[in-house]
Curated annotation (Swiss-Prot):
Cellular component annotations (GO), alphabetically ordered: mitochondrial inner membrane; mitochondrion
Single GO molecular function: L-histidine transmembrane transporter activity
Phenotype when the gene is knocked out: No visible phenotype under normal growth conditions.
Membrane-spanning ranges: 16-36, 70-90, 110-130, 162-181, 204-224, 260-280
pH behavior: Optimum pH is 8.0.
Protein name (Swiss-Prot/TrEMBL): Mitochondrial arginine transporter BAC2
PANTHER family assigned to the protein according to its UniProt record, in alphabetical order: MITOCHONDRIAL BASIC AMINO ACIDS TRANSPORTER-RELATED (PTHR45624), SLC (SOLUTE CARRIER) HOMOLOG (PTHR45624:SF10)
Function of the protein: Mitochondrial arginine transporter that catalyzes the counter-exchange of arginine with lysine, ornithine, arginine, histidine and citrulline. Substrate preference in reconstituted proteoliposomes is arginine > homoarginine > citrulline > histidine > lysine > ornithine. May be involved in the delivery of arginine, released from seed reserves, to mitochondrial arginase and the export of ornithine. May contribute to proline accumulation in response to hyperosmotic stress.
Description of activity control: Inhibited by mercuric chloride.
């Protein structure tokens, strides 16, 4: 059987591939900033992203900014593709009164995003745990070696440390994420939710603002998640991590690295949505708007 031609002939297959392109674009464009964010969050000392960057470059070299990228990059095609697929299903399921020829309602978009965030946490938790530990270490062991080590010492439960906090972070954040994207793109280019003819600038701005909104909303939970997953065994659970972190470093610790995260969120999510939408149009042979490249 010729699997690939048959797979690409389906709308599901083309949407899956487009989602993969979006995920790869997001990882490559924002990974150095993500590494800086992780370093800021786990540090017991407040330090600017620039000072951490300077120290990393001096001690560990430029490659340290991309350490651990293989883990999310290897899984991101499947993960991001599934996120868009699951969202498309749930956004319709939560508001079935909307005709299929119309775009999903904003209510369906928000609830579909919440459900999508909860489901994708099952895949994301072990990937992010490995990524975080690779980003924090100064040795050069790879993701497979680290995963085998965790499985040998702690079993599957070790890879899923932080699942609850990941669900708590991602479910509401994804609801806000997709709602913001749909709302902003419609405001910037009225009617585009139905026609799909927004320009590249609209995709980049709407995607970027969606990323910023979702990260600001969930950031304290992300700080707690990073500390739980770093592997030092200093915390017994979510409440213990929150309590100890605030007691030792004050409430500002919950927002440490936010500036770096916001900058990364705008770049990454603008790239994700732009790459996804452009790839989808190419795969469906849909003629894009004449100004898609110029953004006029």
């Amino acid at each position: 059987m010729d699997f690939w031609p048959e797979f690409m002939a389906t709308s599901w297959g083309r949407e899956f591939v487009a989602g993969g392109f979006g995920g790869v674009a997001g990882i490559i464009s924002g990974y150095p900033l993500d590494t800086l964010r992780i370093r800021q969050q786990q540090s017991s000392k407040s330090g600017s992203a620039f000072s951490i960057l300077r120290r990393m470059l001096a001690i560990e070299g430029p490659s340290s900014l991309y350490r651990g990228m293989a883990a999310p990059l290897a899984s991101v095609t499947f993960q991001n593709a599934m996120v868009f697929q699951i969202y498309a299903i749930f956004s319709r399921s939560f508001d079935s009164s909307v005709p299929l020829v119309e775009p999903p309602s904003y209510r369906g978009v928000a609830l579909g995003g919440v459900a999508t965030g909860a489901v994708q946490s099952l895949l994301l938790t072990p990937v992010e745990l490995i990524k975080i530990r690779l980003q924090l270490q100064q040795t050069k062991s790879g993701p497979i070696t680290l995963a085998k080590s965790i499985l040998r010492r702690q079993g599957l439960q070790g890879l899923y440390r932080g699942l609850t906090i990941t669900v708590l972070r991602d479910a509401p954040a994804h609801g806000l994420y997709f709602w913001t994207y749909e709302y902003v793109r419609e405001r910037l280019h009225p009617g585009c939710r139905k026609t799909g003819q927004e320009n590249l600038r609209t995709m980049l701005v709407a995607g970027g603002l969606a990323g910023v909104a979702s990260w600001v909303a969930c950031y304290p939970l992300d700080v707690v998640k990073t500390r739980l997953q770093q592997g030092h065994g200093a915390y017994e659970g979510i409440a213990d991590c929150f309590r100890k972190s605030v007691k030792q470093e004050g409430y500002t610790v919950l927002w440490r690295g936010l500036g770096t995260a916001v900058a990364r969120a705008f770049v990454v999510n603008g790239a994700i949505f732009a790459a996804y939408e452009v790839a989808l149009r190419c795969l469906f042979n849909q003629s894009p708007s004449p100004d898609i490249v110029t953004g006029d």
